[in-house]
C-alpha cells in the first residue's frame, strides 16, 4: 500500500508508524525543470492538509537514512517510494532538464555514493506527452555511472489514458520492464462514480501471458473498506490511501489475510505476482 501525499517528515513518520510499506510524494519543479520541493498544494484530497513541504535534497537524504540498513533511523517496512512529478506546463526542454536533474538529485542525496539505501522508486509522470522526462532520466543515470540503480527504478503514467497508446510511448522510450499502471481519482469522488472498468482492463492486460508493458497495477485513492475490498477482488498489486492503518486492518481480516498480505523486501515490486 502507498500512503498518499507524504510531503514532510512529520507525516512520513506518522504513516511509517501506522505500518505503510510505500509512500507517494509530490515533487515540484521550477519553470526551467529544476526539482525543488515536495509539495502538492490546493486542491488536494478531502480531509488532508495540502501545504506540507520540504526541499528535495533534504527529503531524499532523509529517505536514504530511513532505507539504509544499519542507519540508526532505518525503517525496515519502507520499501517503495512513488515520486509523483508535478510537470504541468513545463516545456519539452524543461522536461528534458527535469529528468536529468532528478537523476542527479537521487545520485547526490539518496544513493550518496555508497548505494546502500535500498528503496525502490516509481517515477510517476502525469501525461504521456511528458515522456521526454523519462528518456533523459534514464540516460543521465547511465552517464553518471548510476546505471546499475535502474534495477531499483520503475515507471508510471497517471493520466488514466488508453493503455494501448501508453504502450506505444513505452516502446518509443525502449522501456519494457518495471512498468506500473494506475487508475484512480481523488477521494473526494466516490468509487461508484468512477467505476472500475479501466482498472479491470489493466489487470486483465497485466495477466496476458507474455505481455511486457504492465508488471503491476495500483489504484488510488481508496479510503473506504468497500473500495479496498473491491480492489483486492480485482487483483490489484497496491492501493494508495490516506489511511494506511485502516487498509492494513482490512488486509488482516480473516477473509482477506489468507490470500493477501503487505509486501516485504523479499518481494520484487517489478515482478508479476503469480499465485
Swiss-Prot record:
Give each disulfide bond as a residue pair.
44-50, 46-188
Which one of the record's GO molecular function terms can you name? toxin activity
State the reactions this protein catalyses.
an N-(acyl)-sphingosylphosphocholine = an N-(acyl)-sphingosyl-1,3-cyclic phosphate + choline; an N-(acyl)-sphingosylphosphoethanolamine = an N-(acyl)-sphingosyl-1,3-cyclic phosphate + ethanolamine; a 1-acyl-sn-glycero-3-phosphocholine = a 1-acyl-sn-glycero-2,3-cyclic phosphate + choline; a 1-acyl-sn-glycero-3-phosphoethanolamine = a 1-acyl-sn-glycero-2,3-cyclic phosphate + ethanolamine
Q: Can you tell which superkingdom this protein's organism belongs to?
A: Eukaryota
Q: In which tissues is it expressed?
A: Expressed by the venom gland.
Task: State its location(s).
Answer: Secreted
Q: How is the cofactor bound?
A: Binds 1 Mg(2+) ion per subunit.
The principal location of this protein is secreted
Q: Which GO terms describe its cellular component?
A: extracellular region
Tell me which EC number(s) this protein carries: 4.6.1.-
Cofactor dependence is on: Mg(2+)
Residues that bind Mg(2+): 24, 26, 84
Which InterPro entries does this one have?
Answer: PLC-like_Pdiesterase_TIM-brl
Arranged from A to Z, the UniProt key words for this protein are: Cytolysis, Dermonecrotic toxin, Disulfide bond, Hemolysis, Lipid degradation, Lipid metabolism, Lyase, Magnesium, Metal-binding, Secreted, Toxin
Which residues are catalytic?
40 (nucleophile)
Q: Name one GO biological process term.
A: killing of cells of another organism
**Protein task:** Dermonecrotic toxins cleave the phosphodiester linkage between the phosphate and headgroup of certain phospholipids (sphingolipid and lysolipid substrates), forming an alcohol (often choline) and a cyclic phosphate. This toxin acts on sphingomyelin (SM). It may also act on ceramide phosphoethanolamine (CPE), lysophosphatidylcholine (LPC) and lysophosphatidylethanolamine (LPE), but not on lysophosphatidylserine (LPS), and lysophosphatidylglycerol (LPG). It acts by transphosphatidylation, releasing exclusively cyclic phosphate products as second products.
Which family is annotated? Belongs to the arthropod phospholipase D family. Class II subfamily.
Q: What is this protein called?
A: Dermonecrotic toxin LspiSicTox-betaIE4i
Q: Which organism is it from?
A: Loxosceles spinulosa
Source taxonomy lineage? Eukaryota, Metazoa, Ecdysozoa, Arthropoda, Chelicerata
Amino acid at each position: 500500500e502507498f500512503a498518499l501525499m507524504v510531503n514532510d517528515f512529520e507525516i512520513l513518520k506518522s504513516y511509517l508508524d501506522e505500518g505503510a510499506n510505500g509512500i507517494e510524494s509530490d515533487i515540484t519543479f521550477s519553470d526551467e525543470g529544476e526539482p525543488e520541493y515536495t509539495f502538492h498544494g490546493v486542491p488536494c484530497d478531502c480531509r488532508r492538509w495540502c501545504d506540507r513541504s520540504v526541499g528535495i535534497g533534504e527529503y531524499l537524504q532523509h529517505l536514504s537514512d530511513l532505507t539504509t540498513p544499519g542507519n540508526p533511523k532505518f525503517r525496515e517496512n519502507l520499501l517503495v517510494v512513488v515520486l509523483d512529478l508535478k510537470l504541468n506546463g513545463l516545456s519539452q526542454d524543461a522536461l528534458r532538464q527535469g529528468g536529468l536533474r532528478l537523476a542527479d538529485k537521487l545520485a547526490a542525496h539518496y544513493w550518496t555514493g555508497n548505494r546502500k539505501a535500498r528503496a525502490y522508486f516509481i517515477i510517476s509522470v502525469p501525461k504521456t506527452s511528458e515522456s521526454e522526462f523519462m528518456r533523459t532520466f534514464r540516460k543521465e543515470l547511465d552517464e553518471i555511472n548510476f546505471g546499475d540503480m535502474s534495477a531499483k527504478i520503475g515507471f508510471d503514467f497517471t493520466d488514466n489514458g488508453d493503455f494501448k497508446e501508453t504502450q506505444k510511448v513505452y516502446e518509443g522510450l525502449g522501456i519494457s520492464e518495471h512498468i506500473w499502471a494506475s487508475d484512480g481519482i481523488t477521494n473526494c469522488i466516490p468509487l461508484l462514480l468512477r467505476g472500475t472498468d479501466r482498472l479491470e482492463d489493466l489487470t486483465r492486460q497485466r495477466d496476458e501471458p507474455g505481455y511486457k508493458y504492465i508488471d503491476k497495477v495500483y489504484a488510488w485513492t481508496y479510503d473506504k473498506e468497500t473500495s479496498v475490498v473491491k480492489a483486492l477482488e480485482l487483483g490489484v498489486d497496491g492501493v494508495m490511501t490516506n489511511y494506511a492503518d485502516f487498509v492494513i486492518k482490512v488486509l488482516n481480516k480473516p477473509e482477506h489475510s489468507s490470500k493477501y498480505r503487505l509486501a516485504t523486501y523479499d518481494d520484487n515490486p517489478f515482478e508479476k505476482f503469480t499465485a
